[in-house]
Amino acid sequence: MSEVLPLITRRGDRIAFVSGLRTPFARQATAYHGVPALELGKLVTSELLVRTGIDPELIELLVFGQVVQMPEAPNIAREIVLGTGMSVHTDAYSVSRACATSFQAVANVAESIMAGTVEVGIAGGADSSSVLPIGVSKALARTLVDMNKARTLGQKLKLLSGLRPKDLLPVAPAVAEYSTGLRMGDTAEQMAKTYGITREEQDELAHRSHKLAAQAWESGVLRDEVMTAYVPPYEKALSEDNNVRHDSALEQYSRLRPAFDRRHGTVTAANSTPLTDGAAAVLMMSESRAKSLGLTPLGYLRSYAFSAIGVQRDMLLGPAYASPLALARAGVKLADLTLIDMHEAFAAQTLANLKLFASDEFARHQLGRNAALGEVDRAKFNVLGGSIAYGHPFAATGARMITQTLNELRRRGGGLGLTTACAAGGLGAAMVLEVTP
């Protein structure tokens, strides 16, 4: 559906974001090495409650996501509730939409508020690429199940004798799409070739991302939305993202070799987002509930949309498909936006989506629209840098983008912002945010 869909409660309330917070993001195996995503999620949620000053007992719903799952704690949301002082009666469940996971968490909390089943909720996500669910081979897994049913030592030894040495090796988590076997970088390479995205363009975008993120940190605008994280063994604190290159120089990017297509590729480690650890969350409630609690909203959720396309080609075009829906449901055009924040999984993916925003042919043949969304004004685009610089803890990125965009809109005196992301599985997400002066 693409008609205007007002996001209001039965009482006519808008859906308010009251506060947002994240941990500093850290590259894999650095500051959060050995710290599970659950602990990062509890850390940011606890601090969010403290900073807001809201009684934890008032939280009626927590929806949280995690992409790299922890088998020992499959419902990260419920564990966060139990570990942060909220009421045991606070409902909680976990979601996963790959890189758009916290967008989904926000949508779910918004829907519950609109339905009237809750008035106050928290949405967010956490991921750790440093604490991974290392598995075992299928042969060993089957043998272990059979051994559990074996009654005698002889039966167990017979089962073990059928294993080969290679069956005992650990199995690292897959980094490719289950349905295609393609890595994200393979798709980014394909998109770069299909849409004529050059190596120079990708490196320029990556450099821009780091430069703007460094400026954001140096100016202090991120201080209030990023907590200082103290994690075991509590010897050091992290107060800034450790992936941002404060000394980024464009000429350095050309020195790196392609990471996926080694001979003819243009996607490198420098123009891609790195594996990252971190967590982010937002506090949401109905507009009238915020007023009754004496809380001033950061802004409001004007609309949202999700999309799904094929995974064989162009799998990372989610923003080009989801954004037109979100804008239509908000009743606004691209030119009405004050800010546009797009997840930078890869520079190639980002530039391909921007190119299709302006393509009439794509609009007609793929979206069924008469005309393209339009050319994106780069002065409005990823003005504080993006995921290439900050990093990308999969389930946390959406909440980071929402909080960052709302705060920047407030600094600019209000307006509308579009946040949008691609996701594995050919998925996409987009949300229109509103800040009133």
UniProtKB/Swiss-Prot annotation:
EC numbers, comma separated: 2.3.1.16
GO cellular component, one term: cytosol
PROSITE patterns xref list: THIOLASE_1 (PS00098), THIOLASE_2 (PS00737), THIOLASE_3 (PS00099)
Cell compartment(s), UniProt: Cytoplasm
Entry-linked InterPro entries: 3-ketoacyl-CoA_Thiolase, Ac-CoA_C-AcTrfase_FadI, Thiolase, Thiolase-like, Thiolase_acyl_enz_int_AS, Thiolase_AS, Thiolase_C, Thiolase_CS
Enzyme class, broadest EC rank: transferase
Reactions catalysed, as given in the entry: an acyl-CoA + acetyl-CoA = a 3-oxoacyl-CoA + CoA
Keyword Cytoplasm: yes
Gene Ontology molecular function terms on file: acetyl-CoA C-acyltransferase activity
Any Pfam family the entry gives: Thiolase_N
Active site positions, chain numbering: C99 (acyl-thioester intermediate), H392 (proton acceptor), C422 (proton acceptor)
Transmembrane in keyword set: no
Pathways per UniProt: Lipid metabolism; fatty acid beta-oxidation
Keyword terms, alphabetized: Acyltransferase, Cytoplasm, Fatty acid metabolism, Lipid degradation, Lipid metabolism, Transferase
GO biological process: one example: fatty acid beta-oxidation
PANTHER family tied to this protein: ACETYL-COA ACYLTRANSFERASE FADA2 (3-KETOACYL-COA THIOLASE) (BETA-KETOTHIOLASE)-RELATED
UniProt subunit comment: Heterotetramer of two alpha chains (FadJ) and two beta chains (FadI).
Family indicated by similarity: Belongs to the thiolase-like superfamily. Thiolase family.
Protein purpose: Catalyzes the final step of fatty acid oxidation in which acetyl-CoA is released and the CoA ester of a fatty acid two carbons shorter is formed.
Stated name of the protein: 3-ketoacyl-CoA thiolase
